Curated annotation (Swiss-Prot):
Its main location: cytoplasm. It comes from Ogataea parapolymorpha (strain ATCC 26012 / BCRC 20466 / JCM 22074 / NRRL Y-7560 / DL-1) (Yeast). It is found in: Cytoplasm; Cytoplasm, Cytoskeleton; Nucleus matrix. One of its GO terms (biological process) is cell division. This is Cofilin. Belongs to the actin-binding proteins ADF family. SUPFAM superfamilies: Actin depolymerizing proteins.
Amino acid sequence: MSRSGVAVSDEALKAFNDLKLGKKFKSIIYKLNDAKTEIVVDSTSTEDAYDAFVEDLPENDCRYAVYDFEYEVGQGDGKRNKIVFYQWSPDTASVRAKMVYASSKDALRRALNGIGTEIQGTDFSEVAYESVLEKISRTTGLH
């Protein structure tokens, strides 16, 4: 449970394990339930296109998301995958939503073992493919 008293649903954990271990999903978007007491799955996708994942993030509301990010390693060393956690808190979301999502994030992050990188986005440029790739490159020493 988080500082805000929000719990992580069993469904949310199962979906993450299906992404991480079973490669059943490419992405998961999480939200708070209507009562703001539990983090639940908003949607899952098997779509490989990163742009399709970003388009699923709401313009005016907060979400958490996990994406199985695939990228090229330099000099022909092949492809790698890193599970990326997103805290999506657009500038246009209500202050209350931003506060509840910020105070509830740690509960979800602690429950999701195997996250490689964390991204905080307030607008779409911060979650663009190149921005995320740059952050992954810095944390893995690719550049």
